[in-house]
Regions:
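Flexible "cap/lid" loop of the alpha/beta hydrolase fold
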Residues: 101-106, 112-142
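Catalytic histidine neighborhood in serine/cysteine hydrolases
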Residues: 219-240
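Short beta-strand/loop motif that positions the catalytic acidic residue
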Residues: 198, 204-206
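Acidic catalytic loop of the alpha/beta-hydrolase fold
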Residues: 209-213
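Catalytic histidine-centered segment of alpha/beta-hydrolase-like enzymes
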Residues: 237-250
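Conserved HGGG/HGGXW glycine-rich cap/lid loop of the alpha/beta-hydrolase fold
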Residues: 9-65
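Conserved alpha/beta-hydrolase catalytic His-Asp/Glu region
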Residues: 124-130, 142-196
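Conserved acidic catalytic loop of the alpha/beta-hydrolase fold
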Residues: 70-88
């Protein structure tokens, strides 16, 4: 299994290899690098696609300390360095997008373009944060009980085939592993006022049924970026459009990468 020892973390990653332009993709909260398997399959003939597990998720061994999405952005950049990648198209879904924006702000010379899937630059409303905190408290106290994981699966995935696969993964997790990743999510900073600093090309992809991040927030993200293309709306997709609707996501994603990578 490929691991990179960076920033005190043992980061699990998958690298399609090859000499094509590098594309580094980061997963959403409660997900892992496998959520991009369909994108790797669709892109790796022409691109070097790297996917990785963020702190607290998948096979990455987290040091157990608190962290922020700025730390996760630095993990991404350090992984690129470990792999000998000077610059890449960087992107992700939901929290993968949060860290990708921060990577572009941290090291603009290393981020050639951004892929932003079902994500935002701002923070959640107090009402939404309160709901998420209640879910997290239930998980940490009682574990991933059926009612809770079914609700979460329908928010993130909402797919009859994929839901049970991810619920099984969640039930296998130690409940204590939720503490620091959820603190990172719930206490993240708002970077929307800094979007104008990002000058690289960007593509925003968003599910029309995404109830975690609204269409209005996706529009605000696109408008705040100086070089973003029109939003690719994924009809019927919830919060993980690339996972549930790869047949819709992959063609415009590949076309974008061919233009900018």
């Amino acid at each position: 299994m490929p691991f990179a020892q960076v920033n005190g973390q043992k980061i699990f990653y998958k690298d399609s290899g090859g000499r094509g332009p590098a594309v580094v993709l980061a997963h959403g909260f409660l997900m892992d690098s496998s959520m991009f398997d369909a994108q790797v399959a669709a892109l790796s003939d022409k691109f070097r696609v790297v996917t990785w597990d963020e702190r607290g998720f998948g096979q990455t061994e987290h040091d157990g300390k608190p962290f922020t999405y700025w730390d996760s952005a630095n993990d991404c950049l350090a992984l690129m360095t470990h792999l000998g990648v000077d610059s890449a198209v960087v992107g992700g879904m939901s929290q993968g997008g949060f860290l990708s924006l921060r990577a572009a702000l941290t090291a603009p010379q290393r981020v050639r373009a951004l892929v932003l899937i079902d994500t935002a630059a701002d923070v959640d409303s107090p009402e939404i944060l309160a709901g998420y905190k209640q879910m997290v408290d239930t998980w940490v106290t009682h574990g991933p009980v059926d009612d809770l994981v079914n609700i979460i699966a329908n928010i993130i995935i909402a797919d009859p085939v994929e839901n049970p696969k991810w619920i099984a993964k969640w039930k296998a997790r130690q409940k204590e592993l939720m503490v620091h990743p959820s603190d990172c999510l719930l206490n993240r900073d708002d970077v929307s006022s800094r979007l104008g600093e990002i000058t690289c090309p960007a593509i925003v992809i968003h599910g029309t049924n995404d109830n975690a991040i609204s269409a209005e927030r996706a529009e605000a993200l696109r408008k705040g970026l100086r070089n973003a293309e029109p939003i690719v709306w994924v009809d019927g997709a919830a919060h993980a459009a690339n996972l549930t609707h790869p047949h819709v996501v992959n063609p415009p994603l590949r076309a974008f990468l061919e233009r900018v990578a």
